[in-house]
Regions:
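Low-acidity, Ser/Thr- and Arg-rich intrinsically disordered low-complexity segments
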Residues: 2-11, 16, 21, 25
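Short, surface-exposed coil-to-beta transition loops
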Residues: 58-60, 107-110, 132-137
Length: 184
């Protein structure tokens, strides 16, 4: 669903094979009432969350943008801007009956951002034709002289290593494009 590039700082999935991991009983800063079955594993910037027998692998991709975080958030949070910076997701975005739809290379999906907020949270949800909902964590973080956009690519069930890497590379390309658009 995304296209490819190399300018984003990536802490990508290590090559297939053995992975050295350490496990903590709960995530840093977890609240006391968090379910005990939640476990986090950290390895080379990659997270694996075990939750009730299900495992989700994540790859955090970031791009530094020389623009204030509120400007980056304002631009990136408008679904109509997606084709300009995230054509890997889709080149056509349409609003219908208060909902946003994007035509991906494989199908038309419903797209929704988390409610507007002052924290830079740009999490979004893609609802596939099958009814499956894909949660995509994304943040715009302010720093001293600009911002950093962090996008979490999550491995979906059945996704091969090559597909997972291609998805991450495509996100990196889109974040690099977002940087170019906003720094022009």
């Amino acid at each position: 669903m995304w296209t490819s590039a190399a300018s984003a700082r990536m802490r990508g999935p290590p090559a297939s094979g053995g992975i050295q991991c350490t496990e903590a009983s709960t995530a840093p800063g977890a609240v006391a009432d968090e379910p005990e079955h939640v476990r986090f594993v950290q390895s080379w910037g990659r997270s694996i969350q075990h939750d009730g027998g299900m495992t989700s692998e994540s790859w955090h991709i970031s791009e530094r943008i020389d623009r204030p975080a509120d400007e980056v958030y304002a631009y990136a949070s408008i679904p109509a801007n997606l084709p300009r910076w995230a054509p890997g997701l889709g080149n056509s975005v349409e609003e219908a009956d208060g909902q946003w739809f994007v035509d991906t290379p494989t199908e038309r999906v419903r797209f929704a951002f988390a409610p507007r907020n002052d924290l830079g949270v740009l999490d979004h949800y893609l609802t596939l034709n099958s009814g499956e909902v894909i949660y995509v964590p994304m943040r715009v973080i302010a720093d001293e002289s600009g911002s950093e956009v962090v996008f979490t690519v999550r491995r979906r069930p059945g996704m091969t290593d090559d597909e997972f890497k291609a998805d991450g590379d495509a996100v990196a390309a889109d974040l690099a494009r977002l940087k170019r658009v906003l720094e022009e």
